[in-house]
Amino acid sequence: MEEITINIDKIKINDDWKEFLRDEFQKKYFLEIKKQYLNAINQNIVIYPPANLIFNAFNLCPLKEIKIIILGQDPYHQPNQAMGLSFSVPKNVKIPPSLNNIFKELQNDLNITPAKSGDLSSWAKQGVLLLNSILSVEANKAASHSSWGWQEFSDAIIHKLSNEKSGLVFMLWGNYAKNKEILIDNTKHLILKAAHPSPLARTGFLGCKHFSKANEFLKKVGKIPIDWKIV
């Protein structure tokens, strides 16, 4: 079998994150992700988000500025939705139900008028890592890449951030995200847990006040709070 190697200098990810994740990019599981990705592309299978946006969460959120991690599951699988940021959709795209509930909670919590745009890039640029546990999906097939190995990659990121940083906020919404709590050192970081914001989930997200709690914690550890208004 032909050996697959990865030239990390060609991976579209900022230098700070590239160095931070260098070891992960060389591990066997990541080589398998690359192999499956290339096989799908060669079969003309449509994958979301586009290749240049797969690592968008890292490219918009500088490693040295990271303050908050909001963990999603996998990208939106309909056309023009996925942009490499958990829960976010590009400007002029209809706001999905889960994001609608996030905006409702922002209004309840901080009196922020619900945004007309679902693009959360302004959060990312302030240090909010909008990380999906699975970073790609086949068009129209939810969770279709759940067996590729992406979870090992995102778990490694969470664990490494927990070990090497201090004073971070991890927002874990829904049982899938809550299961990642074991990767996080709760003596160094704030872990905020709630139900998933999806309207299909049981009640428990609306009223969680995670956005104000996160900002209070950031101020307590000497960091600038997040401006949650969508720009």
Curated annotation (Swiss-Prot):
Grouped into one coarse class, the protein's main location is cytoplasm
Catalytic residues in the record: D74 (proton acceptor)
So what does this thing catalyse? Hydrolyzes single-stranded DNA or mismatched double-stranded DNA and polynucleotides, releasing free uracil
Protein name, per record: Uracil-DNA glycosylase
Native organism is Campylobacter jejuni (strain RM1221)
Purpose: Excises uracil residues from the DNA which can arise as a result of misincorporation of dUMP residues by DNA polymerase or due to deamination of cytosine.
Q: Which family does it belong to?
A: Belongs to the uracil-DNA glycosylase (UDG) superfamily. UNG family.
Q: Which GO terms describe its biological process?
A: base-excision repair, AP site formation via deaminated base removal
Q: Name one GO molecular function term.
A: uracil DNA N-glycosylase activity
**EC category:** hydrolase
**Transmembrane segments in this chain: where?**
none
Q: Name one Pfam family in it.
A: UDG
The major lineage groups are: Bacteria, Pseudomonadati, Campylobacterota, Epsilonproteobacteria, Campylobacterales
Cellular component, GO, one term: cytoplasm
Enumerate the InterPro entries for this protein. UDG_fam1 (IPR002043), Ura-DNA_Glyclase_AS (IPR018085), Uracil-DNA_glycosylase-like (IPR005122), Uracil-DNA_glycosylase-like_sf (IPR036895)
Provide the protein's localization. Cytoplasm
Ordered alphabetically, the record's keywords are: Cytoplasm, DNA damage, DNA repair, Hydrolase
